[in-house]
UniProtKB/Swiss-Prot annotation:
The lineage of its organism: Bacteria, Pseudomonadati, Pseudomonadota, Gammaproteobacteria, Lysobacterales. This is 1-phosphofructokinase. Catalyzes the ATP-dependent phosphorylation of fructose-l-phosphate to fructose-l,6-bisphosphate. ATP binds at residues 228-233, 259-260. It comes from the Bacteria. InterPro entries: 1-PFruKinase, Carboh/pur_kinase_PfkB_CS, PfkB_dom, Ribokinase-like, Tagatose/fructose_Pkinase. The active site is at 260 (proton acceptor). Keywords: ATP-binding, Kinase, Nucleotide-binding, Transferase. Induction: Induced by fructose. SUPFAM superfamilies: Ribokinase-like (SSF53613). The keyword Lipoprotein does not apply. Belongs to the carbohydrate kinase PfkB family. GO terms for molecular function: 1-phosphofructokinase activity; ATP binding. CDD domains: FruK_PfkB_like.
């Protein structure tokens, strides 16, 4: 089977999860367990797509010092590795989990220092894989040293080849990507309310304001805007229709990776030729629901997604 989707992660991380009874500042602790997982938003998207049965390639930048953690995930899930290797170690994010209170403290360590030459290395890996219609997910933050328009550069490259770019980032990189010419705009974006407010420069306090902001993006050339609204679900907007998709019940536990799973669901909808907005919303929301129920930011099951899709609550925008 030929390649069906690409994800690009410029700032991946190894998630090191340390289990403790209780975290006490200034004290010496004995951990009950520790595990290392390959992480980063695009990596999570690739893993979910692979679980769905898609042939997916992961691109990005990995430090050779600890690339083995990522290589193990790629082998396990059947993900094609097209990551650009550089000297040094990929960053590690510490997650201190307190069993007694079920709380997690995150400590994100500095990442690799990269430059334009490294971004060009990723672009060189990407170029021969691109083709018309191919879903290309550009996801996550930028490491130190890369210019704010790094996603915009890769977005323009993929769009010029006719690929369908799904962009999930925030802050200045999002602003730069959304300033592109109409022909270089992403196919879809998935901001949350706060990220969209940062782009518009003013509060978006209700569904009408969110929908108006989404249509402003569509007027610039984007085909689909998906706005995460937390416990309210997600707002899906196209030029001629909009709807809200909600899970039937609130999930328990960590929401880490739920947004990445939703992006994977959007890519899966493109691959399944889900032409109706409701089909797309059901599948994307079901991916997110299944991720929450699995307890693993990188894991879904096709059976779980199909069951969840039927249970997604679809409503009109008030």
């Amino acid at each position: 089977m030929s390649l069906q989707a690409i994800t690009v992660t410029l700032n991946p991380a190894i998630d090191q999860t340390i289990q403790l009874d209780r975290l006490q500042p200034g004290a010496v602790h004995r951990a009950s367990s520790v595990r290392n997982d390959a992480g980063g938003k695009g990596i999570n998207v690739a893993a979910c797509l692979a679980d769905w049965g898609s042939q997916v390639a992961a691109l990005g930048v990995l430090g050779v010092g600890n690339a083995g953690v990522f290589e193990a995930l790629f082998r396990e899930r059947g993900i094609t590795d097209h990551c650009h290797r550089v000297a040094g170690d990929t960053r590690t994010n510490l997650k201190l989990v307190e069993a007694q209170v079920n709380e997690t403290t995150d400590i994100n360590l500095p990442g690799l220092q990269l430059g334009q030459a490294h971004l060009q290395g990723v672009a060189d890996h990407l170029a021969p894989l691109l083709r018309a219609g191919l879903p290309v997910v550009l996801s996550g933050s930028l490491p130190a040293g890369l210019p704010e328009d790094s996603w915009a550069q890769l977005q323009a490259q993929a769009s010029a080849a006719g690929a369908r770019v799904l962009l999930d980032t925030s802050g200045a990189p999002l602003v730069a990507a959304l300033a592109a010419a109409p022909v270089a705009m992403p196919y879809a974006v998935k901001p949350n309310r706060h990220e969209l407010e940062a782009w518009t420069g003013h509060p978006l306090g209700d569904h009408a304001a969110l929908t108006a902001a989404a249509h402003a993006l569509i007027a610039r050339g984007i085909q689909l805007v998906v706005i995460s609204m937390g416990t309210e679900g997600a707002l899906f907007v196209q030029r001629d229709q909009q709807l809200i998709a909600r899970p039937p019940r609130l999930a328990q536990g960590s929401s880490v990776g739920a947004g990445d799973a939703m992006v994977a669901g959007l890519a899966a909808a493109l691959l399944d030729d889900a032409t109706e907005l409701e089909q797309c919303a059901r599948l994307a929301t079901a991916f997110s629901m299944c991720r929450l129920e699995s307890g693993d930011a990188r894991r879904i099951t096709p059976e779980g997604v199909r069951d969840a899709a039927a249970a997604v609550v679809i409503g009109a925008v008030p």
